[in-house]
């Protein structure tokens, strides 16, 4: 059912949001059966791409990560995405009453997870870790994620579309803050606790 909804949310989001709203998923189920799989897509893809293919900024010398270094970074990135989804869902649940929402934390997790699906799937671009390619795919996924957010909030939160617009904007702001925080934390970890080892060829 999850895979069916995941495909449906990509091709006909408005009707799929309505179907998702009629079902109930627990937070435990979402983390165990959905986030655990989706978060593995970018983590595993980047591990393979950075250790087996490598990347080149100037188009000449290619750089690869050592397997041990990439493995630690991949594991940290994997669990960081768990935390990011949980933080955004908590923020949605905390803000919902301001905009007239009366749903449970489980519904907030559902909204967060399905909205972020394009970003998780875009992680497949990590198999070819070239900056221009990853940024292009990431921007396309981000645009569609924003579209899913604005269409899904009024349906899942059961609020009018005008309130849903402002609520979606608030959620988007939180999401961008979490993204910046995730990037900053990654840079700090790479420079201190998880230093990366490279090899050029």
Where are these regions (language model features)?
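Phenylalanine-focused residue identity feature
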Residues: 2, 28-31, 47, 77-79, ...
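Selected alpha-helical membrane-embedding segments in polytopic membrane proteins
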Residues: 2-103
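Amphipathic, positively biased hydrophobic alpha-helical segments used for protein targeting
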Residues: 19, 24, 50-54, 119, ...
């Amino acid at each position: 059912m999850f895979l069916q909804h995941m495909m449906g949310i990509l091709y006909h989001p408005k009707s799929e949001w309505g179907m998702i709203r009629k079902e109930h998923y627990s937070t435990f189920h979402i983390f165990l059966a959905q986030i655990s799989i989706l978060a593995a897509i970018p983590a595993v893809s980047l591990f393979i791409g950075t250790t087996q293919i490598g990347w080149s900024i100037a188009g000449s010398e290619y750089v690869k990560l050592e397997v041990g270094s990439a493995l630690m970074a991949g594991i940290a990135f994997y669990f960081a995405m768990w935390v990011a989804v949980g933080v955004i869902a908590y923020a949605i649940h905390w803000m919902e009453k301001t905009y007239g929402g009366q749903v449970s934390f489980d519904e907030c997790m559902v909204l967060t997870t399905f909205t972020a699906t394009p970003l998780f799937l875009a992680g497949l671009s990590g198999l070819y870790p070239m900056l221009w390619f990853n940024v292009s795919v990431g921007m396309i996924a981000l645009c569609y994620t924003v579209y899913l957010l604005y269409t899904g909030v009024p349906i899942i939160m059961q609020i009018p579309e005008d309130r849903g617009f402002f609520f979606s904007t608030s959620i988007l702001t939180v999401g961008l803050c979490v993204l910046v925080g995730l990037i900053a934390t990654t840079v700090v970890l790479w420079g201190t606790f998880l230093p990366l080892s490279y090899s050029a060829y």
